[in-house]
Amino acid sequence: KIPLILLNARLTEKTFKRWKLVINFAKEIFKKFDLCIASNKESEEFLKILGVKNIKNYGNLKFSQNNKKINNKLDKAFLNKIKNKKIWCAASTHPGEELLCAKSHLEVKRKYNNVLTIIIPRHIERTQNINRELKSLNLNVAFYSELNGFNENTDILIIDSYGESLKFYDIAKCVFVGKSLNKNLIKDSGQNPIEPAKLGCKILHGPNVRNFTEIYEYLKKLGVTKEINNHNELSLSLVEELKEDKPKN
């Protein structure tokens, strides 16, 4: 028999309630695991209720990832174009958050004319809609897949392919982590901030981080995160954070 391990298991309250609707089926599934390693205390408790016998909680294993070496770093020609830019990212954004970030960009630009905002939407199929939304503010927008359209006047770069986030966290001073200001997603809010935090970024986020409360509380104690409630607060925080450039690794 090959041992079956559930690694870095995370169950949100929403997911747990779904499993409870088919509790007998859930117990049949989860009892097949020889070991479950939970990513947080809440998940550990939910797994116990679902019948898991052997549970360990070592915390979120994403903290153990080595992000010091980023594979496939950004193209040198692109890096040369942005070498004098003040860069921040809006990552894992959801509907409504991109427009909020664009408004903040305009306010920050009054202070730093060389600011570059990089938007990494959670779902890249939304990029064309985001583009139309941002152009309504008369912003110069470029796509990562079409870097020939990127120049010194570009305000916002939209990342329209998956698996690129770490490259941009590596050059950004701070990151707004999305799914935290969309009021329609309060019951299923928040995205994981560990990766940008490990790459030395200040984490800005809205008040709604339900799915990752434990992680945000931990990072807050370390002084890594800051909660903002609207685009004005985001703008003020960005102006403060972008005073100095990100230290080179």
Stretches found by the model and what they are:
Residues 1-249:
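Nucleotide-activated sugar donor-binding and catalytic core shared by glycosyltransferases
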